[in-house]
Amino acid sequence: MGKIIGIDLGTTNSCVAVMEGKETKVIPNAEGARTTPSIVAYADDGEVLVGDSAKRQAVTNPENTLFAIKRLIGRRADDAVVEKDKDMVSYKIIAADNGDAWVQVGDKKLSPQEVSARTLMKMKKTAEDYLGHEVTEAVITVPAYFNDSQRQATKDAGKIAGLEVKRIINEPTAAALAYGMDKVKADSKIAVYDLGGGTFDISIIEVADLDGEKQVEVLSTNGDTFLGGEDFDNVIVDYIATEFKKDQNVDLKLDKLALQRVREAAEKAKIELSSREQTDINLPYVTADATGPKHLNMKITRAKFESLIEGLVQRSIDPCKTALKDAGLSASEIDDVILVGGSTRVPMVQAAVKEFFGKEPRKDVNPDEAVAMGAAIQGGVLSGDVNDVLLLDVTPLSLGIETMGGVMTKLIEKNTTIPTRKSQTFSTAEDNQSAVTIHVLQGEREVSSGNKSLGQFNLDEIPPAPRGTPQIEVTFDIDANGILNVSAKDKATNKEQHITIQASSGLSEDEIEAMVKDAEAHAAEDAKLKELVEARNQADAMVHGTKKLLDEQGEGVEAAEKEAIEKAIADLEEAIKGDDKAVIDEKTQALATASQKLAEKAYAQPGAEAGAEQQGSANNADDDIVDAEFEEVNDDKK
């Protein structure tokens, strides 16, 4: 059985980790960073950029650079939070045929699952490069407060990326798992405050030691799936745009290019103000009007920043109160508070958490990496590499069906440990009713319309009978991923209907399959592009080396030979400008052949001398090498 990797698919950044023996290893990406921006860009030539390369070109390609896509996953286009987001992003958010929130890049319509799959592919490739073999299985984390549609959509993104998602686990639970392995004492109650780029979760977790086995049990969870660092950025962007409009009478929000530059500056300002009292925002030539170019120059103090985000920080405290109440605990009964997510680096956030829980939050957990590490540990549990950990997670929201009068009847209460199964018997509302519609809901409101509709299905061919006589057993079954299966059975006929909830929205199996094939096709394109780049690099090196040799040894070269070499160089330089790898390879070989005699002349005599000299050095140096290096290091340190 291969390794099951752990992926933290974040709103702003993503991270991948794997279990190596008993240790958890966070895997750096190809650029050497331990986290990767969750940004996907579509270039004019069809190339798809992911991570740092996508982030670097965002200012010059704002409409085709997609960020914070996780906030759209599993959501409807007409959701109030999505409507609000449309004004804050530089790309186009559209409604799909089924009403889901999708994005448009050029004339191409993309689901958030497809875009997220790009980031997952990058994480998969990062792990494969490190492990040296193909990776097909993963544990992916989601915010604890994600509903069923959002969980299913995340699983679909994994499938499109070529991964079998062995488990979906909640981010705070994953962080507690990483923390609980070595830092927590037995029988502790911990609060995981997880404020990431786009989502907020609070989980109250009990870690117990049962005969040498760590049991990590979630007592309650709560949160807000549209609250995070992106919102901190947005209020700074709003402030900058408002002040600039007052000063220059130009609305930066109408200029996509300017808006992207302001967004980058806002993110930098937020980060700087976590360690400094004041920051400067300098954006020359940010925009222009009839009077000429406009420059943005502004100072933001930490006090101003805190006044802008105060309402957002306070929004995170109400879920904390609810989570404690649901767990039947007071703040004083919490042994440790763990901060997870990059946004917890903001001093005001840390102060608010300290004030609410009455204790200093722990700082010995890396807020960017803990979630991926916990996912890797869960991967180790599933593959059998880790056998001393038991994870008991919960469902974040109540589940039920709509009954007479538009009321929601709950079958499974929120914070129920999963997996779980619950059945309840219902009946008909009319005489001789031959069919019933089972409308599945998720949420805490008594009125059906106030909750999230997960989907509906019909149970028909019910034998005629007076109202209230037929007995229809409805069963809710939640798996370990928090994904729901619902069945309804007429007890008289044993006729049964059941569905895995995919909501009224979501992707069909055919759509997912098409996206998987599309992703595979792109993988082949990406491989071809990589081969082309490598061929160009090799050709460039050949041109540079040959020109250098001609400069150094040109006097001793016959005119005809020199002319042939120069023609071969010109041909290869022309080939490099094109996109045909075969032509580049052919012209590279032609230059190698044309310059063979020149290379032989250049390296014959000096090469022999250099070899002899090198041999002599090796003989003389002997054991002194270690001492010499040791002395040199000490000199540097003095």
From Swiss-Prot:
Feature: compositional bias, Acidic residues: 621-638
Keyword set, alphabetical order: ATP-binding, Chaperone, Nucleotide-binding, Phosphoprotein, Stress response
GO-annotated molecular function: ATP binding; ATP-dependent protein folding chaperone; unfolded protein binding
Region named Disordered: 603-638
UniProt superkingdom: Bacteria
Residues that span the membrane, as ranges: none
Induction profile: By stress conditions e.g. heat shock.
Start-end of Low complexity biased regions: 603-618
InterPro entries according to UniProt: ATPase_NBD, Chaperone_DnaK, Heat_shock_70_CS, HSP70_C_sf, HSP70_peptide-bd_sf, Hsp_70_fam
Residues where Phosphothreonine is found: 199
PROSITE patterns the UniProt entry points to: HSP70_1 (PS00297), HSP70_2 (PS00329), HSP70_3 (PS01036)
CDD domains: ASKHA_NBD_HSP70_DnaK-like
Entry similarity comment: Belongs to the heat shock protein 70 family.
HAMAP family per the UniProt record, alphabetical: DnaK
NCBIfam families hit by this protein: PRK00290.1 (NF001413), PRK05183.1 (NF003520), prok_dnaK (TIGR02350)
Function description: Acts as a chaperone.
Protein name: Chaperone protein DnaK
Gene transcribed to yield this protein: dnaK
